[in-house]
Amino acid sequence: MKSRNGPLRVGIGGPVGSGKTALTEKLCKAMRDDYSVAVVTNDIYTTEDAEALVRMQALTSDRIVGVETGGCPHTAIREDATINLQAIAGLNERLPDLDVVFIESGGDNLAATFSPDLADITIYVISVCQGEEIPRKGGPGITKSDLLVINKKDLAPFVDVDLDVMDRDATRMRQARPFVFSDMKRGDGVGTIVDFLKEQGGL
């Protein structure tokens, strides 16, 4: 099921260092053989994340666009998504068979959200390294995203985090909304996220 404006648009948000780019890379590699995929990355003053995805060979460079948001990166995914919508339109023009576009936000905080005009599905990524209390702090990313990804679960013993506490708090804060624990370094959890996108996005 493509959106009215073309390909399915998946917004990936989360704080700096949570693993957004790693997730984007893994999703691209997992889906590129079956779907026509592209990426738009958001950085404040550089296109560093886009360049990183090219180096990782997530996709060919013509399928990855980096936009420089300047100032506050939240604005480019929420109040005024024009720069991202233009990037998607450009990709769609070059690649008319596009099925999925991942929109990776700049590093943001728990209050950041994607405009519904920009993203059909939203994924919010947090890391266990931020502390086991993060899920219960709430905020739109934690409570309202379509899927919450709790990443770097392998590091929990090293940062004194109890995954059972995070599981309990995420269940309470999100109510019926799904979440998944992941380890992007090893690709653990990627299959579950891909299945979620296929089901929710009608791919």
Curated annotation (Swiss-Prot):
<dbReference type="GO" id="GO:0005737">
    <property type="term" value="C:cytoplasm"/>
</dbReference>
<dbReference type="GO" id="GO:0003924">
    <property type="term" value="F:GTPase activity"/>
</dbReference>
<dbReference type="GO" id="GO:0043419">
    <property type="term" value="P:urea catabolic process"/>
</dbReference>
<keyword id="KW-0143">Chaperone</keyword>
<comment type="similarity">
    <text>Belongs to the SIMIBI class G3E GTPase family. UreG subfamily.</text>
</comment>
<keyword id="KW-0547">Nucleotide-binding</keyword>
<dbReference type="InterPro" id="IPR004400">
    <property type="entry name" value="UreG"/>
</dbReference>
<dbReference type="InterPro" id="IPR027417">
    <property type="entry name" value="P-loop_NTPase"/>
</dbReference>
<dbReference type="Pfam" id="PF02492">
    <property type="entry name" value="cobW"/>
</dbReference>
<keyword id="KW-0963">Cytoplasm</keyword>
<keyword id="KW-0342">GTP-binding</keyword>
<comment type="function">
    <text>Facilitates the functional incorporation of the urease nickel metallocenter. This process requires GTP hydrolysis, probably effectuated by UreG.</text>
</comment>
<comment type="subunit">
    <text>Homodimer. UreD, UreF and UreG form a complex that acts as a GTP-hydrolysis-dependent molecular chaperone, activating the urease apoprotein by helping to assemble the nickel containing metallocenter of UreC. The UreE protein probably delivers the nickel.</text>
</comment>
<feature type="binding site">
    <location>
        <begin position="14"/>
        <end position="21"/>
    </location>
    <ligand>
        <name>GTP</name>
    </ligand>
</feature>
<protein>
    <recommendedName>
        <fullName>Urease accessory protein UreG</fullName>
    </recommendedName>
</protein>
<dbReference type="GO" id="GO:0005525">
    <property type="term" value="F:GTP binding"/>
</dbReference>
<keyword id="KW-0996">Nickel insertion</keyword>
<dbReference type="GO" id="GO:0016151">
    <property type="term" value="F:nickel cation binding"/>
</dbReference>
<dbReference type="InterPro" id="IPR003495">
    <property type="entry name" value="CobW/HypB/UreG_nucleotide-bd"/>
</dbReference>
